[in-house]
From Swiss-Prot:
Disulfide links within the chain: C300-C364
Gene: Ptx4
Top-rank taxon, per record: Eukaryota
Gene3D superfamilies per UniProt: 2.60.120.200
Binding site for Ca(2+) 1: D322, N323, E406, Q407, D408
Molecular function, one GO term: metal ion binding
Tissue expression from the record: Expressed in liver (at protein level). Widely expressed at low levels with highest levels in liver.
Cofactor(s) this protein cannot do without: Ca(2+)
Limits of the Pentraxin (PTX) domain: 269-473
UniProt induction comment: Induced by lipopolysaccharide (LPS) in thymus. Down-regulated by LPS in liver, lung, heart, spleen, dendritic cells and peritoneal macrophages. Induced by TNF-alpha in dendritic cells and peritoneal macrophages.
SMART domains (alphabetical): PTX
Annotated protein name in UniProt: Pentraxin-4
Cofactor binding note of this UniProt entry: Binds 2 calcium ions per subunit.
Length: 478
């Protein structure tokens, strides 16, 4: 651009100098030559103007081209910068990618090592599982054989339980009959007469004695006519001996022998405990309670009622259940009845109406978990029996045992409507089912059977208005 300007200026200077040198030579010519000169000058001026226009146009084109080139340079510079930025970003990305690739390679190597370890563990587990599966198959075979043996043993045990229950029922029935016969012989004879030497009474005589004696005579006649249903004395003796072998030894000493002073007189039965009213403070605690789980139970006592309803004789409560064992009476129940509760809410309603006459009576309530059988004896007579009551159940140890009140919590929350009013004497509890002869001996005033786990010697606390009375014979107590 600068070179072009210089050339244009140089051309103008040369042109002007030529025109200047021509002017003096022309002055000498005549005036007639001035006109063409001016025309030439005018044409030159027009040419110069055209040239100037062309030059300006050319210069404008050059300037425009320069601007285009300048813009292109700017754009190229921008593109260079952008390419540099892209290259930098590419370098950074490449560095990051290389780092990620290195990390992935490291992770891949670690994964390979872990996979090899896992493969080794899986192989070991597979081997162990195969070994255990073989052992499991062998154990399953052994367990199957054991289950078959257990099933066979259960059938044998069930058969033995059935046989034992049948024998126990026979022993109780035979004992009740023998006790009735002993009572008849004692009332009919003034001396001691052997049972085998007495003359069998006639049906007329038995009818005069009462319907119970006549029914007993009929049972004996049926037994004689049916030998297959008759139990010999030898069988009964053997069963009694077997039952005595399984009696649990007790830490309590046997009570002193009771003195039998004739019909209707029971003496030396332990102190008499008198509950005068329905106060909730009238309660007796026994300790220790049951030290071992009980699968059988015998509760026997002399009782004299002083009200028209039976109160609660005994209550055994644990933290899990406040009615694990209850002889529960209440003024809202049927007169003369109590609820025999084992493991609430199961119970059996027992009728004790003979006790409402205000006289002394001997009661024995017996229960065993074998087939859930239970028996109620009043004055040595079997008055009620049943089965399927808490079959297979165990009365747990460690609870609170009280007389005269029903516990709604362990050792408390008594209700006066459930309180016992009357007298108790000779109370004892066994962890086995007493035999009928043992029950008859108790009702006759003889010594306690061995193995009693609780008696009135275990009384640890007497509360409220409960009184202790020492009477030679029960009939003499107030």
């Amino acid at each position: 651009m600068r070179c072009l300007k210089k050339k244009t200026l140089l051309f103008l200077l040369i042109f002007v100098s030529l025109n200047v040198h021509r002017t003096p030579s022309q002055e000498a010519h005549p005036a007639r030559q001035r006109k063409p000169f001016f025309e030439r000058l005018r044409r030159l001026e027009e040419q110069f103007q055209r040239f100037q226009q062309v030059t300006l146009t050319h210069l404008q084109n050059i300037a425009n081209n320069y601007n285009v080139y300048h813009n292109m340079d700017v754009r190229f510079q921008s593109l260079v910068e952008q390419s540099q930025a892209v290259a930098l970003a590419m370098n950074q990305s490449q560095a990051a990618i290389q780092g990620d690739v290195a990390h992935l390679k490291t992770w891949y190597r670690k994964s390979q090592r872990r996979s090899r370890k896992v493969d080794a563990r899986l192989q070991a587990l597979d081997l162990s599982l195969s070994t255990k599966s073989r052992q499991w198959v062998e154990k399953e075979g052994e367990q199957k054989a054991q289950r078959e043996a257990i099933a066979s043993l259960a059938l044998s045990v069930q058969a033995l339980q059935d046989a034992l229950a049948s024998l126990t029922q026979q022993v109780h029935s035979q004992g009740a009959r023998l006790a009735a016969l002993e009572g008849q012989t004692q009332s009919a004879s003034s001396g001691t007469v052997a049972l085998g030497l007495t003359t069998a009474p006639t049906p007329t005589q038995l009818a005069q004695r009462g319907p119970g004696s006549l029914q007993l005579w009929r049972d004996r006649q049926v037994a004689k006519s049916s030998p297959q249903h008759r139990s010999s004395p030898h069988d009964v003796t053997v069963h009694v001996q077997e039952m005595q072998k399984f009696q649990t030894p007790s830490s309590h000493q046997a009570a002193p022998p009771r003195t039998y002073q004739g019909p209707g007189n029971i003496c030396n039965t332990d102190p008499v405990l008198i509950f005068p009213n329905t106060s909730t403070e009238n309660v007796i605690f026994l300790s220790p309670g049951f030290l071992m789980p009980l699968r059988a139970l015998s509760f026997c006592s002399w009782v004299r009622m002083a009200t028209s309803h039976l109160g609660t004789l005994l209550s055994y409560a644990t933290k899990d259940n406040d009615n694990k064992l209850v002889l529960h009476g209440r003024n809202s129940l049927v007169p003369g009845s109590i609820h025999f509760v084992i493991g609430d809410p199961d119970f059996r309603e027992l009728s004790l109406k003979p006790l409402l006459d205000g006289q002394w009576h001997h009661i024995c309530i017996i229960w065993t978990s074998v087939e859930g059988k239970y028996w109620l004896h009043i004055d040595r007579r079997l008055v009620a029996t049943g089965s399927r009551f808490r079959e297979g159940y165990e009365i747990p140890p460690g609870g609170s045992l009280v007389l005269g009140q029903e516990q709604d919590t362990v050792g408390g929350e008594f209700d006066s409507s459930e309180a016992f009013v009357g007298s108790i004497s000779g109370l004892a509890i066994w962890d086995r089912a007493l035999l009928p002869r043992e029950v008859a001996n108790l009702a006759s005033g003889k010594e306690l059977p061995t193995g009693a786990i609780l008696t009135l010697t275990n009384v640890t606390s007497v509360g409220g208005f409960v009184q202790r009375a020492k009477c030679t014979c029960l009939e003499q107590c107030p």
